[in-house]
């Protein structure tokens, strides 16, 4: 990928630096320890995955599989009391970590949207900083119409857009979806400009190396996801001109 020499404007005045599964490179992923550490290191956004237990609780975990006594079972088939203690509920997350950050959630259970939005609202989380991600665009579009106060994110890959990126962006704009989220290797300056033309935020994930982060900030992306919060904050400070802040999206 050709490097970008001058930083192009993002739609968000101060881009979001998302700590992927908390400070995953520094602490066990998706734990309260990892999330607290990510904020101490300077991230202004946290990212996680959410599932619903058999008894209806929303919990934070990536794989959604519980291994006990040599057996693997989906979290959806296990009650909360049978989960390992390191897996927090969404209520516990807000209680321990607070609300002063952007929050990106990969929704792994399509029936979890209502509970996620309700619990976030009851915890006084600013819903304009709640970014709900899903890999199926039809699921995202459907829920966009149900929950108007939160942010919706189409998490996809360029290779999966059979209609092409311009038509996908037009579809997202038509249905009020806020964001196009792709792997960093899918983005280039032209595609970031295209997303912005359709009034979409451009999010880029899996950025682990400084030169990749630098190039994407200069492309004008609106958010980046990384396991290495220390690297991310350092590059952010150089390219944006200050440490990450909690500013609102445009």
Predicted region positions:
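Structural preference for beta-strand elements that scaffold enzyme active sites
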Residues: 16-18, 45, 102-104, 129-132, ...
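An active-site metal/cofactor-coordinating segment within enzyme catalytic domains
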Residues: 7-17, 44, 50-102, 108, ...
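Active-site beta-loop-alpha junctions enriched in small/polar residues
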Residues: 22, 51-53, 63-64, 108-110, ...
């Amino acid at each position: 990928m050709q490097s970008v020499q001058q930083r192009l404007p993002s739609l968000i005045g101060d881009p979001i630096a998302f700590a992927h599964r908390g400070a995953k490179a520094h602490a066990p992923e998706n734990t309260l320890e990892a999330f607290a550490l990510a904020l101490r290191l300077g991230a202004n956004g946290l990212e996680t995955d959410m599932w619903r237990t058999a008894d209806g609780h929303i919990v934070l975990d990536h794989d959604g599989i519980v291994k006990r006594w040599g057996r693997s079972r989906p979290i959806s088939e296990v009650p909360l009391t049978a989960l390992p203690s390191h897996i927090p509920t969404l209520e516990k997350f807000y209680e321990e970590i607070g609300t002063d950050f952007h929050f990106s959630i990969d929704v792994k259970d399509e029936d979890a949207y209502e509970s996620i939005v309700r619990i976030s609202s009851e915890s006084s989380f600013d819903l304009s900083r709640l970014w709900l991600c899903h890999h199926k665009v039809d699921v995202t579009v459907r829920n966009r119409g149900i929950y108007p106060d939160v942010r919706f994110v189409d998490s996809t890959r360029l290779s999966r857009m059979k209609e092409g990126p311009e038509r996908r962006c037009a579809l997202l704009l038509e249905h009020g979806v806020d964001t196009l989220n792709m792997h960093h290797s899918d983005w280039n300056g032209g595609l970031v400009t295209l997303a912005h033309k359709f009034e979409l935020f451009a999010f880029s994930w899996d950025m682990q190396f400084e030169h990749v982060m630098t190039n994407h900030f200069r492309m004008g992306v609106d958010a980046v996801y990384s396991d290495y919060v220390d690297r991310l904050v350092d590059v952010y400070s150089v390219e944006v001109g200050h440490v990450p802040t909690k500013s609102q999206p445009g």
